[in-house]
């Protein structure tokens, strides 16, 4: 039938077949043949004429005729009218039906059916399946497009089974089940095929029931986890790994019986149809469904007549290019191998013959099932009326064909169009939005309504459509229940999938960032929730309304979304999964790092969702308990390789590494994948705007980013400041992190503009990740955090804290991390964005703006000074960025050194840092809880924290033992200390002020010290972080900054030399990184200090016990101890051959950095390759620089350690440059660790 039919119509309008059926129009066509609307000249009724070419290799109509004849007299089966053949074609004539279920579902505003409609349709479909099984045949292609509603008032509420072309007889002449074949070719439609079909096993009766189950889920959710995946093998793999019980949450509870039963069946076992029918009956009773209730597509017109609403003119059967769009039985086209069916098994007497045309002898037309006899022509074709009304009614979604997995080429004919022979009455004024009726129907039954509501709120297990449907439902709920979400959603909440995001959904192409559908959110369908693809609003949690707006990550800005989409296009498919497009709303869940990890998938999904929607609600469970959403996301991760890659490793370490390798790639240097980074940041970007609301949700995001995405997210965050107030905050953070580094970050941020806004809290997470990761991670963390700060700018909390001190620390740690690990180097590459000085300068300007905004709250002058310094550092960093581009890993190391160097410069620019500190302190006051939470997340991931060699060793030790449990414990410990952290933040604020007055060198040292330890310390406590910062600053400056120091020394950009005690610098830095209460609230220094202490504990301890003990110490000691810890901890990263923290920043600048002395701090962090290349090498050589797996040491006197670290850093710098750098790194690890941690904290 595909022979001549594909190019030229087999029949033309006006042709008379067998001198009885006059062709009126073509209503469908596909691989199997064509379907025509014909007029029966004998009965004067419209019929469906299905034709296949006689030259077609696989003859399908023989089986169709055989089965159709066997089924005559059964309910839900079209009336057979006639058949025949000639030299040109074979044909079958049957009763013409109305719209198919696939088209009807897509016509709904949400792309879903209510429970009421789903249950009644499901029961009818089950009856039709039982009917075909009763005659010894399997349908083998059960799907929505193969079921259609009747055309006339008497039949419009009856569902008819269509398309028996793939049927197979499973019984022999004796009625016994035929033995199964060892290998049977795949038959059916990929989306709805059973696992047996994918395994090429002989299909049995239970396989038709599995397809029914998938249909029911799609009816309720709007999509399946593998909806957009066309590859048969991939879909089969997903189905095998997917926990189908996750789908039950969308169905009535009774369907657990349905699933259990079909799961227990095999080829030979006869299904208990009575049991399955009782499931539908009981559910109908439970939800108060009334059989006479109108279906979702039916509405009551003004005249009281029942009208069916249709939104598309697509053929009745869309699957496999099904031409039976108007309910033409067996009208489904068969694509590809579907034609390879054993039609030769048709009984010999089932041949097509003209003699069989006509009504069977002895059977009056009136007695035929569904036959109304001659009066039928007088009956109104309800579907034609619907079509007429359709012309005057614009439906929100009409994406009929795209949804069918096999409908690559939809039937060209419009089966939905009114038949030429049937009367058409236009009653557009009568039709009402079909959305109203479902609502009324819901209100009729409390149970039904509640179920619908629950289904709406709950997240989809794995599918794009699942997610979309849930998202859409959530959108409604969100608009009603979440004002905070609505602003950013704009109408569509995006959810990082349970993925994200339930990774299974990731497999869905819809979940994939959908490079093919980057503008899906803009499409009318997506705007509607996507008739076929987009049900953007999805709340994984069944109690979405219970979630605070804080728990939602929202993207308010179209610009951000556009940027995100742009970024998605690049990294969309790299990190995203097919489910990226699927918008899903994740609620912030108080969950363990594992939960957050689970949410990585959701973020991937979020990327897609964000692409789809300008406004996305990203609610991830940062620290909340794991929920079904997170579980779903986990499933998605498992099912979605793409999603997994996007999220990288579920574990913090793998995540960080993956991000470093791929998404991390920033703009200028050969970074892993800018696209992936951008996509990640893009998703975060959506989350970032809601940052104010969602600090915790951001944590999971950070985890997602931690390997590489975190970096990209961080980079994006820094880039964010240019794009808005949030970005300004980011800029402030970045300024403090390292002016040189900041420009690079800004560049990357610009490229990843969207990510930051989505990453308000995620930035913080990234910061922690950054700590865990080598320098780049740190930088990314900083960026993310700063992005979060952006949102907090309005809050007046987070931004300043990170920008002033954390920035420098971040830079140092980044270099440190880069030295430690190659992956981290890729992360560091994100900082490499610096090469674009202009962009960096712009970023600095933005940062300046943000800083001024934040500092206006605290210390505007300092911020301004810092901004200026940042600009200088940007220049330096640009040159270093070039170096980094030349060397990814070495570049990252160089970035660390550069970062440290930049930190030194920043210290010179203490006034600016002071401003940043001021801003940070305010930010700390503004959102200490979120920041703390984010840090706690990082604590769990501290293993990824880039640390000096020693620090890495200790970090690895503590990290591996701490792992999820320790991280969770740390998180728990951290949360109780939020108040303390807040107090610490206040203390840090004052400390930041001290930093501003302190010499640049001290600041630089502090920053250098902070980087490695900062991640873990940051995770632990703000206070410990501060302590670690001072220690780390010294050690990190010594090791990390040693090259950076030389660079910073070389950097020609003059920087104000304001000396600040290392303790002060560290504590201020820490305070910057600590979450602050919302703007207007007094800063809480103690809380920050407590957090820093935690971080310090993480950084300094080699084991979990050490971490905990240190954490306790930090909590006890207060902000002073964190400061000292920072000094001690600051690992002497090879990049910090710089003089002790007190030494001027310039000395820190290494000769290699001299060309970029002004922007060296940035350069060292972002692009060590050029000026910080020696640093980069050092990083490579020194594991702690690359990454500190174990928390950097938090112990040690801050000043002494700093000095030691600096000294150590100098040798380390040389060592890093040389082969001995690794040794130096390890040697300096102890001292630098503390410093590195503070840097991490600061970066946060």
Swiss-Prot record:
Residues 1145-1171, 1188-1203 have a biased composition (Low complexity). The active site is at 141 (proton acceptor). Residues 674-683, 1059-1073, 1116-1130 have a biased composition (Polar residues). Residues 674-694, 1052-1088, 1116-1244 are annotated as: Disordered. It catalyses: L-seryl-[protein] + ATP = O-phospho-L-seryl-[protein] + ADP + H(+); L-threonyl-[protein] + ATP = O-phospho-L-threonyl-[protein] + ADP + H(+). Changing residue 163 to A: Abolishes serine/threonine-protein kinase activity. Residues 1075-1085 have a biased composition (Pro residues). One of its GO terms (cellular component) is ciliary basal body. Residues 21-284 form the Protein kinase domain. ATP binds at residues 27-35, 50. It holds the Pfam family Pkinase. Transmembrane segments: none annotated. Changing residue 181 to E/A: Impaired serine/threonine-protein kinase activity. Serine/threonine kinase that acts as a key regulator of ciliogenesis: controls the initiation of ciliogenesis by binding to the distal end of the basal body and promoting the removal of CCP110, which caps the mother centriole, leading to the recruitment of IFT proteins, which build the ciliary axoneme. Has some substrate preference for proteins that are already phosphorylated on a Tyr residue at the +2 position relative to the phosphorylation site. Able to phosphorylate tau on serines in vitro. Belongs to the protein kinase superfamily. CK1 Ser/Thr protein kinase family. This is Tau-tubulin kinase 2. It comes from Homo sapiens (Human).
